[in-house]
Each structure stands twice: as C-alpha cells, then as structure tokens.
Amino acid sequence: MMAMKPIKGAVNRRFRPSSYRKNDSLAKETIIAYLEDNGHTILDSEENYSFDIKSEKNGNIYYSEVEMKNQWKGDWNTSWKEIRIPYRKHKLINKFEEVKADNTFLNFYVIRGDCKQAWRIKDTLLEKSEVKEAQGFRIEPGEHFFHIPYEEAILVELEDGLRNAS
C-alpha cells in the first residue's frame, strides 16, 4: 500500500489535555484487560506518540489504538450508520506499514463510555473506508474522518467494563 498523505486544507482537532487525562489511561486499561483475557501478553503501553498498545499472542504481534466514545451509551445507536476515526490516525497506518510482516496486525478500538463494549476495526477495513469531512457538535470544521460502516466492524464485549473503577 502507498503511504497515506495529509489532506490539503484539512484541520485536526486541537489537543485537549483534560480530555486526554480523563480518557487515555481508561481506554488503555480497558483494552489491555480485554487483550490479556484473550491470551495476549502486553509488550508495551507507554506513551510514545505511536501505537497505544503492543501485544503478542501465539507468535503474532498486535498493535492497538484506542479511543473513547463517551457519547455512546447503551446499545449502539443504529442511526449512527458509521464509526468515525479521525483521519489524523493515518500516520499510524503509515507507521504500521514500516513494521508490517505476515504475523503483525493493527486494530483500532472505539470504546463505549461505560467500557462494556468496543468496536474493533482492522487496519485493512480502515484503509478501504471512505475519508471525508464530518459535522458534529465536537468536530472542528474541516476535520476529516475515516467513515467505517458499523456493520463491517466487530463488536466486542468487554467483561464488566472499567468505568466503575474510576
């Protein structure tokens, strides 16, 4: 695959330290617990502005990127026809291409606000998804997203969630 390029004229949401502090460790802890429950050994989850989590299972290496969707409460709202992942994450797909081998995988997890479910989106699905501008209450004008039809993603059940721990 050719490297994904920035979109001319597109904007990225400003970094919000308070949102990061509230969501990053919770999202990582939630998916680390899920991965460990499914036989993964966690190799790295330190903040390094790269993949959120690196794990190993059965000789395969998995890279995971995690994101909270606090607006998602209860069952998925089927009027939300797609899951949106910020296009700025294309940098991770490019980085993954540098380390990609037959036994490496990249998954994006979009986690429900109470941490009881998540959508798992494989890099191959993300790569073929439509990229376009989106509108919404928290979306900056000009910000682009991958638009993934939710029916094509994998809904995973997360034990009891971790929200009650915070």
Where do the protein language model's features map onto the residues?
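Beta-rich catalytic cores
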Residues: 49
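Conserved catalytic cores of phosphodiester-cleaving nucleases, focusing on short active-site segments
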Residues: 35, 53-74
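N-terminal cationic leader/targeting segments used for protein routing and processing
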Residues: 58-61, 90, 165
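Non-catalytic C-terminal interaction segments of nucleic acid-processing enzymes
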Residues: 37, 102-105, 110-166
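Short secondary-structure boundary/capping segments within folded domains
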Residues: 43-46, 54-56
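Catalytic cores of nucleic-acid endonucleases
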Residues: 10-18, 25, 29, 37-38, ...
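Charged, low-complexity intrinsically disordered tails and linkers
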Residues: 1-8
